[in-house]
Amino acid sequence: MLQINSRLAVIDGWLVDTVKRKPINFRSPEVRLLLPNDDDYKKLSQQNLVDWTRLKKDSNSVLVGVKSMELFKHIKLVLREFFLLEDGRIILKRIRSKLRYKVVKKLTCKCCRLYLPKWGTVYIHPMLKDKEKPLAGVCEFSLDVNPDREYPLIEINVSHQYIIIEGFLLYLNERRLYRWNDNNLRGQVGLTKWAHLRKTYNPVNLDILYSLNSNFYFVKDDLLFQLLGKRVFVKFCKVMENGKCGKAPLWYRVKRTTTAKATHIAYAISNSTAPDSFKSKNNDYRFIVREKPIVENTISNLDYSDIKKQQFTEAEVVKRKISADISQIENVHTQFNSQKEKNNIRVNKVSSEVLDQISKFPVSRVTLLLMSAGQDKNYIELVEELARRLEKICIEKTTQSLEEIRDTFQANPEMQARFDKEYYQSIEEYKITLELIKEDLLITLIKQMENMWAAEKKFSTEEEYVSPRFLVADGFLIDLAEEKPINPKDPRLLTLLKDHQRAMIDQMNLVKWNDFKKYQDPIPLKAKTLFKFCKQIKKKFLRGADFKLHTLPTEANLKYEPERMTVLCSCVPILLDDQTVQYLYDDSIIPEFEATSSYATKQSKCGRKMSLQMEPDLLFQEAIRRMRHLTAYDVLRRNYIAAFEELYMGNCND
């Protein structure tokens, strides 16, 4: 270290303000103010100082390692969190939202911030040499999350999501831990499923932590700390607890501390959130401690095996007591619980790699599936926007229909109050049903839409007039006079065409009509010219969940298939040589959806007029029946598909 004056010194090529404990850029104007003496300034200019601009030019990352242990003894270090991206760069955590690269690893280290006016900000940290002892107070660690590990994701009525990590129940919507033995949670989940989940996963570790005399609980899985986000730095302390016969046994407790003295990271839980029976304890906080230390501290006089033994011994006793208490609650409630549980509870497996990509919960199963499949972020955002628009259309349509039923009781406030209980419950239920329909249909609808843009079968796209009457287009020979396709092998062509014209047709790659005999269902085509010049008829078909059209079933093969629905489609009939008829339809046009017939509409209107003349109780029952019908899965499913078609046709017309 070369002392320039009482304040400035040069340490391994770095100019350091030893009073403010920070590096100073030699090119900064403040250097001249700190060195009014010309001799001192000349002395400084003769030193081989580090060029700060090279730090940014030579590195794609904002975190730069410096091999100077002496330098970091004389400057202040602060703890910062960084992301290691898949392209190899290291960036500051808070600017992740601006980037499109996947985060490979999260790391935290003590560093010093340097600001370069033209180049931005970099952070320097000590880069240790081989066989060199770690610098006291400089800690570096990263959260080590296994991307392939899977966790149970519990969904309650679609909109509430929980995850279980090492026996801790985390409410993802608020990123908050929950006690398992909680009356509100038990009521939300339902007693039967609450008991089943407890036996399967036993997520009672927060209950155990609140019951311990110790104020800490070790956790190995770093995903818990990653999802909770807010972390504190702690260390273990020895305390003397009053025991029997005046003895004072040794006891370990966790205490918050500075980053320089910290041995572990932890998540702090205030005792104010604990049950009333635990609030009398003297401790303000309890800590979920990451089992792996920040840095291996060889100087520490603490025996971590004793600390872990303390937790294990105490936790086993508490766990048995809590399990017995919960079992007793289950038995008592089971005897007196006769209510049917209506909540929709689902448990799925989700990997930590997928969880790391989610910024906000709850997240739909559709999004989870797309993330698991490795879909592009922009594609997922488009699908989510489409889902929101479809949901909005369906909710507006269904709510309008329900409001019409509700208006029936405007003249009878007592009956309306009675109906409103069912009304608001139906609104909640059909919104959940819509979410389930989205999971069942949305990806399928999108795939079918994409398939519509691709030809089902590739035909020749040549367009050529063989004669003023006959045109070859889209792989077909079209009779413009009769406005229909004609078989190239039709014997009538012998009289209608000349030899050279027939020879021209033979050289073209046209559709072989015998191939149509292989198809039992209508054939989708992308043939704009064919459908432009040929007469089309309207015909009813069945449309399956795969969006393909099928012929209507006959009495011989009639069977109930709820996933199919009747549609009216424009098509071109062709008569084959065996006198059977095949139908060609444009697969870029979505057929008309027969939601309700005119007769059914009239019947509905008549039924509404008749309902006004019913007795109040009969009117109420009829209104409930109609409301149940409107919010049924099959009806909402048809509305969802109709909304999708509406958006699709709107985009096509644009």
Swiss-Prot record:
Domain of life where this protein originates: Eukaryota
Keyword flag Transit peptide: no
ORC interacting region (OIR), as annotated region: 449-587
Predominant subcellular localization, coarse grouping: nucleus
Cross-referenced SUPFAM superfamilies: ORC1-binding domain
Subcellular location: Nucleus; Chromosome, Centromere
This protein's UniProt keywords: Centromere, Chromosome, Nucleus, Repressor, Transcription, Transcription regulation
Entry-linked Pfam families: Sir1
GO cellular component annotations of the record: chromosome, centromeric region; nucleus
Region listing for Sufficient for interaction with SIR4, in residue ranges: 322-654
Entry keyword Lipid biosynthesis: no
Function: Involved in the establishment, but not the maintenance, of heterochromatic silencing at the cryptic mating-type loci HMR and HML. Is recruited by interacting with the ORC1 subunit of the origin recognition complex (ORC), which binds to HML-I or HMR-E silencers, DNA elements that direct the formation of silent chromatin at the mating-type loci. Establishes transcriptional silencing by recruiting the three other SIR proteins, SIR2, SIR3, and SIR4, that function directly in silenced chromatin and establish repression. Also found in centromeric chromatin.
Quaternary structure annotation from Swiss-Prot or TrEMBL: Interacts (via OIR domain) with ORC1 (via BAH domain). Interacts with SIR4. Interacts with CAC1.
Protein name: Regulatory protein SIR1
Gene for this chain: SIR1
